[in-house]
Amino acid sequence: MKKRFIFITGGVVSSLGKGITTAALAAVLEARNLNVTIIKLDPYINIDPGTISPEQHGEVFVTEDGAETDLDLGHYERFIRTKMTRKNNFTTGSIYSEVLNKERKGEYLGATIQIIPHITNTIKKRIISCAHNVDIVFVEVGGTVGDIESLPFLEAIRQIAIDIGRENTIYIHLTLVPYISITKEIKTKPTQHSVKELLSIGIQPDILICRSQYTIPIQARSKIALFCNVLKESVISLINVDSIYKIPKLLNLQKVDQIICHHFKLKVPPADLSEWDEVIYNELNTNNVVTIGIIGKYIKSPDAYKSVIEALKHGGIKNKTVVKIKLINSEKIEKNGTNRLNCLHGILIPGGFGHRGITGKLITVEYARINNVPFFGICLGMQIALIEFFRNVIGLKDANSTEFSQNCQHPIISLIPKGNRNLPNINNNVKKKLGGTMRLGNQTCYLKQDSISHKLYGKNIISERHRHRYEVNNKFINKIEKYGLKITGKSKKNKLVEIIELSNHLWFIACQFHPEFTSTPRDGHPLFIDFIKAAIQYKKIKQK
């Protein structure tokens, strides 16, 4: 199969939405019956984002095969049907690590190791390895053109055009075209300088996607085309929109997919964007509004809970409901009480690590349980729900997790037992390092047939993604059924608790896995869809 690559770079400033633009463009080409995939190149020195603070870098997106990756891979999976793997995201750190390991083993036969060719060849090899059985590979280069960290990646993608032919590569450059409100002018100079910087590296962009507050007029586009040496029709205006799911249509209307297919000489049908039209229709034609509270400790950066936020919106789309999301600091609940929870129609506690903010989360679970507020616990959220239940319902006041109190009398939650660590991606050497030491990726879960979860999924066996190193201590689970808390999902051979449900409650479900990673705007996810449905019901009850 012929190898074709589209390389996407960014200029002027960061945070232009390069990942979303890449994903949306891939979605349009997928809608033309093309098989596409996307790679993200991250220029930081970390091996992966697994140990980076969510407040700095946003969430860690977990793939089916257990890779801890950049949050942009979440955007990719939400826009296209292709599932990402560990091959779809790599960092400068992982490249250097691979090269240095080979050098230590003597695989370079005594050669002096250099950026060119050793680092760039390793980058090229990884990129090209993703081109099997796909029509087009999109490659998003992280960072901004001009950053020193991105130079090896840019050099590698420059060389790929030489290796496989310019006719099999397209370079797309995403830039900012600012609007100056005082003079009421759109300024093209930053884009010109950004392209000049890219040209100095040896890359001539074929398409310019210009991010702007307003539609860029034809005159300004013609000027950009002239000074940046691109065709006028290849200067694309991408304005700010109220929904990212409108972007595929915006790109299609400006015939970006047609330009790409013409360059690659691909004879494919027009893009069928009917599924995206349905998503937008459901977003615009809503019947309800609900407010969902996400209770966490990384609320300064909404990107820390990106997939959860998007999954809640998907649940809203499927219920034709506007979902308003409040990010609430659990530490403030601990200090100031539960008043700020009174306006919520549903409460969600997402995954997390460490003891900070735990007391506020325990207070929140108790509030939701007592007041019949729909509650959804994910990963740590399930563990918190169990600790609260053991303390306040069963009466084990010292119930805790060994993550928060190593010597607690009743360790309801503890490290995954050694006997269960023969699962994929588990590293037994937890104390010596943090990176790559968790139960990661897709794991099988067996559902109890008379449960809500079984009804929602419509099957006996499911597979969901995990990211945790602590689990429910099986020594204590026999006590909970008689108090009304049901274990409705377990891992293979009943080793680990995966889902719990509270009886006699409007909606109280918690799971050890991360369902947000598999939710999409076109399909949603059964747990999130039903959670929003319960929030709508709770709002109606509350209004009576």
Swiss-Prot record:
<feature type="binding site">
    <location>
        <begin position="15"/>
        <end position="20"/>
    </location>
    <ligand>
        <name>ATP</name>
    </ligand>
</feature>
<feature type="binding site">
    <location>
        <begin position="380"/>
        <end position="383"/>
    </location>
    <ligand>
        <name>L-glutamine</name>
    </ligand>
</feature>
<keyword id="KW-0436">Ligase</keyword>
<dbReference type="GO" id="GO:0005829">
    <property type="term" value="C:cytosol"/>
</dbReference>
<comment type="similarity">
    <text>Belongs to the CTP synthase family.</text>
</comment>
<feature type="binding site">
    <location>
        <position position="140"/>
    </location>
    <ligand>
        <name>Mg(2+)</name>
    </ligand>
</feature>
<feature type="active site" description="Nucleophile; for glutamine hydrolysis">
    <location>
        <position position="379"/>
    </location>
</feature>
<feature type="binding site">
    <location>
        <begin position="187"/>
        <end position="192"/>
    </location>
    <ligand>
        <name>UTP</name>
    </ligand>
</feature>
<comment type="function">
    <text>Catalyzes the ATP-dependent amination of UTP to CTP with either L-glutamine or ammonia as the source of nitrogen. Regulates intracellular CTP levels through interactions with the four ribonucleotide triphosphates.</text>
</comment>
<feature type="binding site">
    <location>
        <position position="14"/>
    </location>
    <ligand>
        <name>UTP</name>
    </ligand>
</feature>
<keyword id="KW-0547">Nucleotide-binding</keyword>
<feature type="region of interest" description="Amidoligase domain">
    <location>
        <begin position="1"/>
        <end position="266"/>
    </location>
</feature>
<dbReference type="GO" id="GO:0046872">
    <property type="term" value="F:metal ion binding"/>
</dbReference>
<keyword id="KW-0665">Pyrimidine biosynthesis</keyword>
<comment type="subunit">
    <text>Homotetramer.</text>
</comment>
<dbReference type="GO" id="GO:0005524">
    <property type="term" value="F:ATP binding"/>
</dbReference>
<feature type="binding site">
    <location>
        <position position="469"/>
    </location>
    <ligand>
        <name>L-glutamine</name>
    </ligand>
</feature>
<dbReference type="Pfam" id="PF06418">
    <property type="entry name" value="CTP_synth_N"/>
</dbReference>
<feature type="binding site">
    <location>
        <position position="14"/>
    </location>
    <ligand>
        <name>CTP</name>
    </ligand>
</feature>
<comment type="pathway">
    <text>Pyrimidine metabolism; CTP biosynthesis via de novo pathway; CTP from UDP: step 2/2.</text>
</comment>
<feature type="binding site">
    <location>
        <begin position="187"/>
        <end position="192"/>
    </location>
    <ligand>
        <name>CTP</name>
    </ligand>
</feature>
<dbReference type="InterPro" id="IPR017926">
    <property type="entry name" value="GATASE"/>
</dbReference>
<dbReference type="GO" id="GO:0003883">
    <property type="term" value="F:CTP synthase activity"/>
</dbReference>
<dbReference type="InterPro" id="IPR027417">
    <property type="entry name" value="P-loop_NTPase"/>
</dbReference>
<keyword id="KW-0315">Glutamine amidotransferase</keyword>
<dbReference type="GO" id="GO:0042802">
    <property type="term" value="F:identical protein binding"/>
</dbReference>
<feature type="binding site">
    <location>
        <position position="72"/>
    </location>
    <ligand>
        <name>Mg(2+)</name>
    </ligand>
</feature>
<feature type="binding site">
    <location>
        <position position="223"/>
    </location>
    <ligand>
        <name>UTP</name>
    </ligand>
</feature>
<dbReference type="InterPro" id="IPR033828">
    <property type="entry name" value="GATase1_CTP_Synthase"/>
</dbReference>
<keyword id="KW-0460">Magnesium</keyword>
<feature type="binding site">
    <location>
        <position position="403"/>
    </location>
    <ligand>
        <name>L-glutamine</name>
    </ligand>
</feature>
<dbReference type="GO" id="GO:0004359">
    <property type="term" value="F:glutaminase activity"/>
</dbReference>
<keyword id="KW-0067">ATP-binding</keyword>
<protein>
    <recommendedName>
        <fullName>CTP synthase</fullName>
        <ecNumber>6.3.4.2</ecNumber>
    </recommendedName>
</protein>
<feature type="binding site">
    <location>
        <begin position="147"/>
        <end position="149"/>
    </location>
    <ligand>
        <name>CTP</name>
    </ligand>
</feature>
<keyword id="KW-0479">Metal-binding</keyword>
<dbReference type="GO" id="GO:0019856">
    <property type="term" value="P:pyrimidine nucleobase biosynthetic process"/>
</dbReference>
<feature type="binding site">
    <location>
        <position position="72"/>
    </location>
    <ligand>
        <name>ATP</name>
    </ligand>
</feature>
<dbReference type="Pfam" id="PF00117">
    <property type="entry name" value="GATase"/>
</dbReference>
<dbReference type="GO" id="GO:0044210">
    <property type="term" value="P:'de novo' CTP biosynthetic process"/>
</dbReference>
<dbReference type="InterPro" id="IPR004468">
    <property type="entry name" value="CTP_synthase"/>
</dbReference>
<feature type="active site">
    <location>
        <position position="514"/>
    </location>
</feature>
